[in-house]
Design a protein with these regions (language model features):
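A short hydrophobic beta-strand segment most commonly corresponding to one strand
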Residues: 76-97
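Basic/polar phosphate-binding segments, predominantly the helix-turn-helix DNA-binding elements
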Residues: 162-170, 190-215
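N-terminal positioning helix adjacent to the helix-turn-helix/winged-helix DNA-binding module
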Residues: 128-131, 179-187
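An amphipathic alpha-helical interaction segment
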Residues: 116-175
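Generic protein-terminus/edge-of-domain signal
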Residues: 1-62, 66-76, 98-123
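Regular secondary-structure segments
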Residues: 40, 133-144, 188, 192-195
Length: 215
C-alpha cells in the first residue's frame, strides 16, 4: 500500500494544495495530510477504509489522515483534490466561531451514519453546486498562478468552501452518535477529563487530527 507524505503534494511553505484530475484510477493508499475530494464530472466509486461509495458530480468527501483510500472511475469521472496540512487546520482554520463544526467534520464515520451508508459526506446540487464549483475553480487558478498573497487568498476561499459544507451538514442535523460511539463523544470526554486545565483550540483539534487513538 502506497503512503503519500506531505512532501509528495506540498511545495515549500505551502499549507494548502489544489489539484484537478482527469479520469484515472487510484490504488489503495494512505496519506499523512487531510484531503477533500470534490467530484466535478462523471461517476465513479470511492473506497474509504474499505467501504464503497458511489459518487457523481456534486459529491464532496472528507478523508482524514491515515485512513485508507482508493477509487475507480466510470463515465469520465473528474475531480478536485484539496490537500491540507493537519497543523495548518489546528493553528489557522479553527476559531471560536467554527471550532465545533471543524471538529465534527473529522467525524466522518458518524456523519455517514446520519445520511445513509451509501452517501458521501455531502452532496451539492443546483445553485449550491454551481457556487462550490466556482469557488474550486478560483482556488485552482490561484494555486497554479502562485502570485503574492496566494496563501491568504486560498485560505479565504477554503473558509467559504467549508462554510458550504457546514451548511449542508447542518441540514442533516449535524453528527449523531453511532452504535460504536463517535469522535465527538470522545472529544467531550477528553474535555471533561481535563476540565481543570486551560485547553486551547489547538489542543482540542489535535485530539481529532493527530492522536492515533481517534482514527
Amino acid at each position: 500500500m502506497h503512503h503519500y507524505t506531505e512532501n509528495h503534494v506540498f511545495c515549500e511553505n505551502e499549507n494548502i494544495a489544489v489539484v484537478f484530475h482527469p479520469a484515472h484510477n487510484e490504488e489503495i493508499h494512505i496519506h499523512d495530510f487531510v484531503e477533500l475530494v470534490y467530484i466535478a464530472g462523471g461517476r465513479g466509486h470511492q473506497y474509504i477504509d474499505g467501504k464503497k461509495y458511489s459518487v457523481m458530480r456534486g459529491d464532496m468527501l472528507f478523508i482524514n489522515l491515515n485512513h485508507t483510500h482508493a477509487f475507480t472511475t466510470d463515465k469520465g469521472m473528474e475531480y478536485y483534490n484539496i490537500y491540507l496540512k493537519p497543523g495548518f487546520i489546528s493553528s489557522e482554520l479553527i476559531n471560536a466561531d467554527n471550532a465545533m463544526q471543524m471538529l465534527t467534520l473529522t467525524a466522518f464515520e458518524d456523519f455517514r451514519e446520519t445520511v445513509g451508508e451509501e452517501s458521501p459526506v455531502v452532496r451539492f446540487s443546483g445553485g449550491e453546486m454551481a457556487e462550490v464549483e466556482s469557488c474550486l475553480s478560483a482556488m485552482l487558478r490561484e494555486y497554479e498562478h502562485k502570485e503574492n498573497g496566494t496563501g491568504t487568498v486560498l485560505q479565504s476561499y477554503l473558509m467559504i468552501l467549508l462554510t458550504y459544507v457546514f451548511r449542508k451538514m447542518a441540514a442533516f442535523g449535524g453528527v449523531q452518535p453511532g452504535e460504536n460511539g463517535n469522535k465527538i463523544g470522545d472529544l467531550i470526554q477528553y474535555i471533561e477529563e481535563n476540565c481543570t486545565q486551560k485547553l486551547s483550540l489547538t489542543e482540542l483539534s489535535e485530539q481529532c487530527f493527530y492522536n492515533p487513538s481517534y482514527f
